[in-house]
Swiss-Prot record:
Name under which the protein is recorded: Acetylserotonin O-methyltransferase 2
Function: Methyltransferase which catalyzes the transfer of a methyl group onto N-acetylserotonin, producing melatonin (N-acetyl-5-methoxytryptamine).
UniProt organism field: Oryza sativa subsp. japonica (Rice)
E.C. number(s) listed in UniProt: 2.1.1.4
Cellular component GO terms, alphabetical: cytoplasm
PROSITE patterns the UniProt entry points to: SAM_OMT_II
Length: 366
């Protein structure tokens, strides 16, 4: 008995181990504060204030320009302390006063007066949206309750699908569509710089689920010879701006028909759907394109879990993104999972090019 007690004592954590475990646990619990602090920074347009102030601003400068209530100056300081320690902004001491400056991350939040050429503030709103966050608190019910298992966590939390919310709530729909435009512009800017060869030699392309046509506009500008078409739901394409003369918008249902083109582009679309639906979409894509030797292919821009940067942040982001997508019963796939649906849809080969950090370009051939 004494020996067993001694062995159990030896297995107990040391004081330092206990403290470190507690810190790590609490750090996880407080992770949502990073998102809410970022959300506040976007609402207050702190990045724009710093930019307009010559690239550096004191706390008083920020307070004067964000409409801060006089009683909240110390609270703003505390918010900025979190935003600097997490790398959104930088801070330096200048003559005893904190001076806040932009980082590479906060430059992505610039969106005023055309300064934010790589603006992602609306996309950040999409990803950190309280509607999505609240949905994740329904995952336990979604996992364990018979009725809930036939719904998405978003439906469990809000009583409608994510897509119904976007269609019926003008403000939410506007933010979502603006976020998709921002993400497409940044992604296409990188792709056209690093992998523009994927569009060489083609004469027509259809962007399925292409929203307001940001990706198609980038391609049409870089390759004026490519006739671009955007297919999306009628109410989405009806609101699309006339961004380029060489783009045609078609309202339709991607599960019923995809117009013919040399190449079908699917950007961040298939991760919204389970395998059976992906196979249906891809089979229609295969019907829409010519044979491989005639230039036919499908270009997919998605996460391939486990492929890409070896740095911890992109690898962790892939897994976080995967669980995030659960809120609409979506999924981020590993290579073997992609291969399975490609083969089931009747494709013969594919090529993965990881040029987007956590995301990759997948070229799929008939």
């Amino acid at each position: 008995m004494a020996q067993r007690v001694q062995e159990e004592d030896e297995q107990m954590m040391s004081t330092d181990d206990l403290i470190q475990a507690q810190i790590k646990l609490y750090h996880h619990c407080f992770a949502f504060i990073k998102s809410t602090a970022l959300w506040a920074a976007i609402d207050l347009r702190i990045a724009d204030v710093i930019h307009r102030n010559g690239g550096a601003a004191t706390l008083s400068d920020l307070a004067l320009n964000v409409g801060l209530h006089p009683t909240k100056l110390s609270h703003l300081r505390r918010l900025m302390r979190v935003l600097t320690v997490t790398g959104i902004f930088a801070v330096e001491d200048r003559n005893g006063e904190a001076m806040y400056t932009l980082t590479r991350v906060s430059r992505l939040l610039l969106n005023s007066d055309g300064e934010g050429t790589h603006a992602l503030s609306q996309m950040a709103r999409v990803l950190a949206n309280p509607l999505a966050v609240i949905s994740h608190f329904s995952i336990h019910e979604w996992f364990t309750t018979e009725k809930a298992t036939t719904m998405t966590p978003f439906e469990v939390a809000h009583g409608c699908t994510r897509w119904e919310m976007i269609a019926n709530d003008a403000k939410d729909g506007s933010v979502f569509n603006a976020g998709m435009v921002e993400d497409s512009r940044v992604a296409m800017d990188i792709i056209l710089k690093e992998s523009c060869g994927i569009f060489q030699g083609i004469s027509s392309l259809i962007d399925v689920g292409g929203g307001h046509g940001a990706a198609a506009a980038a391609i049409a500008t870089a390759f004026p010879n490519i006739k671009c078409t955007v297919l999306d739901l009628p109410h989405i394409v009806a609101e699309a701006p006339a961004t380029h003369s060489n783009i045609q918008f078609i309202g339709g249902d991607l599960f019923k028909f995809i117009p013919a083109a040399d190449v079908v582009l699917l950007k961040c679309l298939l991760h919204c759907w389970q395998d059976d639906d992906c196979v249906k979409i891809l089979r229609l894509c295969k019907e829409a394109i010519p044979a491989r030797d005639a230039g036919g292919k499908v270009i997919i821009i998605e996460v391939v879990v486990g492929i890409g940067s070896e740095e911890i942040v992109p690898k962790e982001m892939q897994l976080l993104f995967d669980v995030f997508m659960m809120y609409i019963d979506g999924i981020e796939r590993e290579e073997y999972e992609w291969k399975k649906i490609f083969l089931e849809a009747g494709f013969s080969d594919y090529k993965i090019t990881p040029v987007l950090g956590a995301r990759s370009i997948i070229e799929v051939y008939p």
